[in-house]
Amino acid sequence: MIKIISKEKGKISFVTDMGESLANAIRRSALEIPILAIDEAEFYKNDSALFDEVVAHRLGLIPLVTEKTFTEIERCSCKGKGCSKCSVDLKIKAKGPCTVYSSNLKGKAGVVYDKIPIVILNEEQELELVARARLGKGIEHIKFSPGLVYYRNVAELHVEKDCDECKKCVEACPQKILKIEKGKAEYDVYKCDSCEACVEACKEHGKNVIKVEKANELVFFIESWGQIKADEIFIKATEQLQDNLKELGKELK
């Protein structure tokens, strides 16, 4: 069972009754989705205040639009030498005074965000380089990660009959999603993160009438860095998990 809670640009969250072991396997499989990122940089000029290595590190973390036409370099017919099927070159040629942004990267691969600052160039300072991007996986380096994938249990909040409705728990709720009406708790079940601030506030008041328990459902959150869509991350992660299980089955035979 999957029920969408919210879906917006770059983000999706849903409720599911899958077990935690499966959810964690999908989460980890997201790090095996091939993602395009800058892996090498050759500098011809760099008069900035930053070392080449620092600029190269920043380049690697710039999200690039990952097209489906690219092939992983290990599987490419060029046998790792690098060609148009498995890699793409991006160039920067800038002269100060200016701020060099991700939009200054010119090539056949687009950047997700135009205004990521790379380096500041003062008067007469220059930056000229060629960067090569390739497909990689998050298990190799975090720059190849497609986004943030995490989950938590749905919370169940119970109020005992002897609640005096002092509202101390309501005031303590950091997300302001809790109400106590006629001895019953009203709250957004999918926004409650089981922080138990309400429980602690109740104890400080001399009571112990609120309990927070885990339900048999999970809230799944996916936030994309922009290389691929958030829902694609989930789909590709499940496909990757299936592929891994098939490989495991072959090894066990």
PLM ranges: what are they?
Residues 1-253:
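Protein-protein interaction/assembly regions in multi-subunit complexes
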